[in-house]
Structure formats: C-alpha cells, structure tokens
From Swiss-Prot:
<dbReference type="GO" id="GO:0042802">
    <property type="term" value="F:identical protein binding"/>
</dbReference>
<keyword id="KW-1133">Transmembrane helix</keyword>
<feature type="topological domain" description="Extracellular">
    <location>
        <begin position="154"/>
        <end position="163"/>
    </location>
</feature>
<keyword id="KW-1003">Cell membrane</keyword>
<dbReference type="GO" id="GO:0043410">
    <property type="term" value="P:positive regulation of MAPK cascade"/>
</dbReference>
<dbReference type="GO" id="GO:0007204">
    <property type="term" value="P:positive regulation of cytosolic calcium ion concentration"/>
</dbReference>
<feature type="topological domain" description="Extracellular">
    <location>
        <begin position="233"/>
        <end position="245"/>
    </location>
</feature>
<dbReference type="InterPro" id="IPR017452">
    <property type="entry name" value="GPCR_Rhodpsn_7TM"/>
</dbReference>
<protein>
    <recommendedName>
        <fullName>Alpha-1D adrenergic receptor</fullName>
    </recommendedName>
</protein>
<keyword id="KW-0449">Lipoprotein</keyword>
<feature type="transmembrane region" description="Helical; Name=6">
    <location>
        <begin position="343"/>
        <end position="367"/>
    </location>
</feature>
<keyword id="KW-0325">Glycoprotein</keyword>
<keyword id="KW-0472">Membrane</keyword>
<dbReference type="GO" id="GO:0045907">
    <property type="term" value="P:positive regulation of vasoconstriction"/>
</dbReference>
<feature type="transmembrane region" description="Helical; Name=1">
    <location>
        <begin position="91"/>
        <end position="115"/>
    </location>
</feature>
<feature type="region of interest" description="Disordered">
    <location>
        <begin position="10"/>
        <end position="71"/>
    </location>
</feature>
<dbReference type="InterPro" id="IPR002233">
    <property type="entry name" value="ADR_fam"/>
</dbReference>
Length: 561
C-alpha cells in the first residue's frame, strides 16, 4: 500500500498478472498492473496511475517496476493529459499536499515579514527564529513541490542530475531547520539563566557567527552523496530517493538529529528548572515584602518641578532642590510551573514526534534491510518530518503576543505599527494629586510637561482593564500632598507574572542603544539629571542598580516597556 492509497479511494480495476513485479499489458481500458518495485525507498508507480504511454495498450508493456497505461482518455477514473495518466487518487493526494505546502510557505513568510516590518521584533532571539523560518521556507518552496509531484505521478520525472541536487537540498534544509531549533533552545537558556548579562553575551555579531556555523554544518552533512558517499545509482532515472548507504545514514542521523535532540532536551529541562526556581524565589519575596519583590524601577531624576495651587501641572524650578521622580514599572515574572511545563512539552514533543520516526527507521533499515517498514508506512514517516516545517511557525512565534499582533497587522496590510514616545503614552489616564480641598483635576495632555514626575505602574489584584468608572473614582479620591502623576501603562493583572528577567534585559538594552540613535530628544531631556534601573535580586533584599547616561533614555518607546 502506497502513500496515495492511504489518503484516497482506490479506483483500480482487475489486476493483470506480472512475472517481474511490474505491470501486465495495458490492452484493456480497465486493466491495470500491480505496484512496481521500489528502489532507494521510492515506490514504483501504480497501474492506472501517472505513467507515460504513447502507443496502444499492447505496445505499452512495461519493464520492471514500470506500469503500463493507455495513451489518452480515461482509464478507470484516471485522466490522461499530454501522455500522463493521473488517477483520481493522485489528484486527491495532490490537493492535500498542495494545501500542506501552501500552509508551510505562508506561515514561514509571515514570520519573516513580521520581524522585517517591526523594529521592536528585531532582537537576537527573533533572528534565530527568522533563520528557522528561512530554512523551513526554503524546504517548502524548493523541495516539497518536487516531492509532492513524485507522489502524484508515482515516479521521478526530472532526471538523475536534478535528483541528486534535490536530495542534497532536502538534507541541507532539514538539517538547518533542526539545528535552528537547537540554537533557539540554547539562546533561551542563556536568556533565562543570565538575563541581565544576555545583551553582552549574545550580541548580533555572535548571533551572525552562530548562524554561519549552523549553515556550514548543514552543508557538510548534505554534500556527502554529491561527492559519492551513496548507494550505486539505479539504472532507471525515473526512480529517485534518499541515500540509504549505511555509513552516511548513521552519520547524517547523528549529526542532523540525535545530537541536536540531546541539546534541545537538556536545554529546555534547564529552562524549566531555572524558571521554577525563580518563580518560587519571587513568590517568597512577595510574601515577605508585598509590592516590592517583583518591582523593577526605572528612575529618572529631574530638576525641580511643582504643581500649581489649582492642581494643574506646573514647571517652576527651585534652586538647590531636586525632586526625584520615577517611572515605576511592575514587570512580569516567569510563567507558572504548569504553563512552563505545557509549553516545553509542546516544543519538545512536536519536534520528537515529527522527526524521531524517520531518523529511527533510516539507520535501522540501512543496517537491517529485513526490518524496513512497508512503502506506505515509510511514506507517512517521510512526510511527517516535513510536517515539522509547517508547525514551527505556529509553535515558536505564536507563543509571543507581539508576533500574533504582527501577524494580524500583516494580514490587514498594515506593515508598521506607529511607535509613540514613552512620554506621550496614555495621557488620558494620568491624574494629579495635591493638598487642595477640591477634587483632583484630570486633563488629558498628550505629552507630559518638562520636569513632571511620572509613574508607570501595573497594580496586582482582581479585575481587568481600567474602565471609565474606575478612572473617575480614582481621580476623585483625596490624596496627601504630593506631585505624583500616574500613567497606567499596563492594565491590572490577576497576578504580576511571566518573564521578569527577559523584560529587564530587553529594557536595559533599549536604554543603552538610545544614545546611538540620531533622533531628536524628547521634551524631558533638558530636565533630566540621571537615569537608573533598579532590579531586585531573587529572594534577596539587595538591589542591583544600573546607571545610564541622561541622554540614553530619550528614544525609549512605549513598545520597549
């Protein structure tokens, strides 16, 4: 039973006899030959399927593994076009595989365009994901169409030379895809284990060197058959398959799958252990000091600022006095253990499910030919590995909300998202508090005045996003005398969870890179004296304080936090 027989309905007529495993004479309109033999793991064509025939039925006596066929017209549910007879089975398989290939191409293109069109997604980690998408896209566009054509026609129709090139590109793309998954696992472990040092450890130059090495290794693995490390070439050019030479099968399986799989499993286990330990430490810190243990504070020390007697913001400066204001951002912690376990199970489980059967059967069948699976089973296993390239765009990028939003913008033909300055964000949510007897005023300026003390916070507790009623109640409450104005950058959450370290390192990197941009400074730049980022250590009282140049923060955007 072939791959086509599994996915479609059989339309074959009575079979004729054959002494060599090939087909019988194709004289009758409803007579078809049985399946031919297989060379190199590729099955012979099925009678009544896609075959070449130009003479009469009696003239179309086939050689071993080559079915006979009528020259034109219809044969038992088959359609003849230009000398090729394509069965209804082949049409069904072709439609299924075409949808499969288009899905893989579209998904990987979305990943690449999302990063290319959104500057805030252009990070080192996402560069590795883009490399994975490039490998999968190359596989989907340059390899799978020819594999699908061979499944539909039942034979290889592109010649011996192109068969060798196709097989090499197949191994190249699959190996690069698997090694990209391995690189992503190492990158995520480094990002979680050494979050504050991550920008210095994983620079763009190092990432480029890693990707170059990755493709070099994939190239070395793939060129073996082109240099002669393969089985004897079959005489019939209509057969094309992967090389099953024992030495190369073991070498390619170890380098392309078993070593990367070991690294992936170890790295993701370490990620889970570190995330679990960090989550427990942060939860313990919150119990000891509620509201402080998980808080990361970006402080901007400004010159004197005052609030007018009516409660409206003022910009009066006072000599010898410095009013310290802060942008207090309650960033997200690591995922809870259950969510982390679920995500890692999906990542590792799908990878192993897709590739392990193929890389188990390939060396086993090379060493022990009597243990090789049937044609139909091997074809399913073969395409299951290709399926991993189709689901990769769903597993990795779609686990990020930013990627999901970028996908939606691309589907709506909105390539770029307008990025507003941090100081112009959510102006309608701010409030001023004074000691005046009157209620606090809440105008809606789009840009905060120079020297104004700002606070960006996310408060834990029940509830969802702010509503007009809750905003009115907050603005009408009496407060002690202060000059605090608050922007709610993040909505209230049930728990302040997920990815504390990654957010801190990203924010730190954005602040550092601000000084290298040649953009106009924001309105507060002239009033700022110092910028610092305070990060509490896990489960400890000490705080790590990182100072920055006053001008470095000027290009900090809403999307950076």
């Amino acid at each position: 039973m072939t791959f086509r027989d599994i996915l479609s309905v059989t339309f074959e007529g009575p079979r004729s006899s054959s002494s060599t495993g090939g087909s019988g004479a194709g004289g009758g309109a409803g007579t078809v030959g049985p399946e031919g033999g297989a060379v190199g793991g590729v099955p012979g064509a099925t009678g009544g399927g896609a075959v070449v025939g130009t003479g009469s039925g009696e003239d179309n006596q086939s050689s071993t593994g080559e079915p006979g066929a009528a020259a034109s017209g219809e044969v038992n549910g088959s359609a003849a076009v230009g000398g090729l007879v394509v069965s209804a089975q082949g049409v069904g398989v072709g439609v299924f595989l075409a949808a499969f290939i288009l899905t893989a191409v579209a998904g990987n293109l979305l990943v690449i365009l999302s990063v290319a069109c959104n500057r805030h997604l252009q990070t080192v980690t996402n560069y590795f994901i883009v490399n994975l998408a490039v490998a999968d896209l190359l596989l989907s566009a340059a390899v799978l169409p020819f594999s699908a054509t061979m499944e539909v026609l039942g034979f290889w129709a592109f010649g011996r030379t192109f068969c060798d090139v196709w097989a090499a590109v197949d191994v190249l793309c699959c190996t690069a895809s698997i090694l990209s998954l391995c690189t992503i696992s190492v990158d995520r472990y480094v990002g979680v284990r050494h979050s504050l040092k991550y920008p210095a450890i994983m620079t763009e130059r190092k990432a480029a060197a890693i990707l170059a090495l990755l493709w070099a290794v994939a190239l070395v693995v793939s060129v073996g058959p082109l240099l002669g490390w393969k089985e004897p070439v079959p005489p019939d050019e209509r057969f094309c398959g992967i090389t099953e030479e024992v030495g190369y099968a073991i070498f390619s399986s170890v380098c392309s799958f078993y070593l990367p799989m070991a690294v992936i499993v170890v790295m993701y286990c370490r990620v889970y252990v570190v995330a679990r330990s960090t989550t427990r430490s942060l939860e313990a810190g919150i119990k000891r000091e509620p509201g402080k243990a998980s808080e990361v504070v970006l402080r901007i020390h400004c010159r004197g600022a005052a609030t007018s007697a009516k409660g409206y913001p003022g910009t009066q400066s006072s000599k010898g006095h410095t009013l310290r204001s802060s942008l207090s951002v309650r960033l997200l912690k690591f995922s809870r253990e259950k969510k982390a376990a679920k995500t890692l199970a999906i990542v590792v489980g799908v990878f192993v499910l897709c590739w392990f059967p193929f890389f188990f059967v390939l060396p086993l069948g090379s060493l022990f030919p009597q243990l090789k699976p049937s044609e139909g089973v091997f074809k399913v296993i073969f395409w299951l590995g290709y399926f991993n390239s189709c689901v990769n765009p769903l597993i990795y990028p779609c686990s990020s909300r930013e990627f999901k939003r970028a996908f939606l913008r691309l589907l709506r033909c909105q390539c770029r998202r307008r990025r507003r300055r941090l100081w112009a964000v959510y102006g309608h949510h701010w409030r001023a508090s004074t000691g005046d007897a009157r209620s606090d005023c809440a105008p809606s300026p789009r840009i905060a005045p120079p020297g104004a003390p700002l606070a960006l916070t996310a408060h834990p507790g029940a509830g969802s996003a702010d509503t007009p009623e809750t905003q009115d109640s907050v603005s009408s409450s009496r407060k002690p005398a202060s000059a605090l104005r608050e922007w709610r950058l993040l909505g209230p959450l049930q728990r302040p969870t997920t990815q504390l370290r990654a957010k801190v390192s990203s924010l730190s990197h954005k602040i550092r890179s601000g000084a290298r941009r040649a953009e106009t400074a924001c309105a507060l730049r002239s009033e700022v004296e110092a910028v610092s980022l305070n990060v509490p250590q896990d489960g400890a009282e000490a705080v790590i304080c990182q100072a920055y140049e006053p001008g470095d923060y000027s290009n900090l955007r809403e999307t950076d936090i």
